[in-house]
């Protein structure tokens, strides 16, 4: 093994050890208001994208923006995805998830949102992001979980770290899956 290979191996082991040492970690992010433009999002302290937790929290905000304005939400999501913007299939998927008035979906990840209050979050807006023992299993990626007011288990979201600057970007999100029907839309409520 060459010196370079040893250095590379040591660096990789350090990243894996750091990721796995996260274990069960929980971070809460509080926002006075939801950003209404990419510039407003980029002005937030979390926009440094220096931890996967920050990027995950901003992803929820971007999805909330998408529910209100697809163009602004797309801008935000593309920025959070770094060098890998949304493709046509991914945009079609997003549009499908918000169909039939399901614009409440991303708000289920904001504290205070429940089916009984039609997923109306409390203010200030708080988003919790969690890691567990499997979060850092894949080098350069971090699988995190966001508790959902409309489901029993937190939903996964995956980030990827860019090697050149250490920033974390959105890789995959599984946040727009089915949740309990909001009370106003439930004929049996």
Task: Map each language-model feature to its residues.
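Surface-exposed, charged secondary-structure patches
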Residues: 92-150
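Core segments of small alpha/beta cavity-forming domains
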Residues: 20-111
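Short beta-strand edge/turn micro-motifs at domain boundaries
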Residues: 147-188
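Generic hydrophobic secondary-structure signal
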Residues: 63, 80, 123-128, 144-146, ...
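Glycine- and small hydrophobic-rich membrane-insertion segments that are intrinsically disordered
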Residues: 2-28
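Large, modular interaction/toxin scaffolds in secreted and membrane-associated proteins
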Residues: 4-11, 68, 123-124, 135
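Context-gated lysine
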Residues: 6-8, 25, 54, 70, ...
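Surface-exposed, polar/charged interaction patches used for macromolecular assembly or partner binding
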Residues: 7, 112, 117-122, 181-183, ...
């Amino acid at each position: 093994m060459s010196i370079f290979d040893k250095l590379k191996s040591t660096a990789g082991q350090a990243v894996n050890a750091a990721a796995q040492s996260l274990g069960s970690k929980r971070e809460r992010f509080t926002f006075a208001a939801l950003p209404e433009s990419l510039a407003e999002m980029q002005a937030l302290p979390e926009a440094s994208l220096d931890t996967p937790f920050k990027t995950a929290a901003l992803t929820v905000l971007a999805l909330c923006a998408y529910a209100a304005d697809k163009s602004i939400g797309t801008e935000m999501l593309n920025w959070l995805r770094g060098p890998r913007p949304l493709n046509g299939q991914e945009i079609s998927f997003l549009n499908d998830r918000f169909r039939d008035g399901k614009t409440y979906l991303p708000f289920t990840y904001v504290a205070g949102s429940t089916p009984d209050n039609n997923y109306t979050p409390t203010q200030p807006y708080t988003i919790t992001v969690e890691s567990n023992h499997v979060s850092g299993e894949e080098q350069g990626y971090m699988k995190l979980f966001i508790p959902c007011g409309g489901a029993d288990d937190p939903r996964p979201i995956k980030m990827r770290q860019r090697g050149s600057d250490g920033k974390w970007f959105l890789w995959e999100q599984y946040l727009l899956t089915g949740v309990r029907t909001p009370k106003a839309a439930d004929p049996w409520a």
